[in-house]
């Protein structure tokens, strides 16, 4: 019994000593723990909790520079109150939600000081592809998967239907490699 108690205390202390998700401030969160580095900017969600869709900006990169990781759009999920939510299709979002351009314009005006203080400053994030590109003359190409290798990461907008988020709620954004489900990354987001 005493051994079990000591083991439990060690687990609790180790978990407290090595937090997985860092709160970077200004609605930004990052996690360097898993094989996929993941940073999430949730500033737009926190500014507009009543929107029918939640916009998160995801920054992903591989921890091992020699590994090529491909994340399929179906392998990006939001877990809220124990329920897993998938992203809508691009067609569904464009049909049901006219606020995409407003979201992106609003996001451009948010401060990036929080997210840039994380590991993302060490990687390059090409803007040629996106899961949810805004329609326009010089828009990125819509893709169903994003790849990362070496010092090149993948940045994309991710939308989820709003399940009724409120201030103080916690949710988790999870991603995994298309070919190897053991290669994952996740970030816990606290809605403030």
Question: Which sequence ranges carry the predicted segments?
Answer:
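Conserved functional micro-motifs across diverse proteins
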Residues: 20-192
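Sec-dependent N-terminal signal peptides
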Residues: 3-15
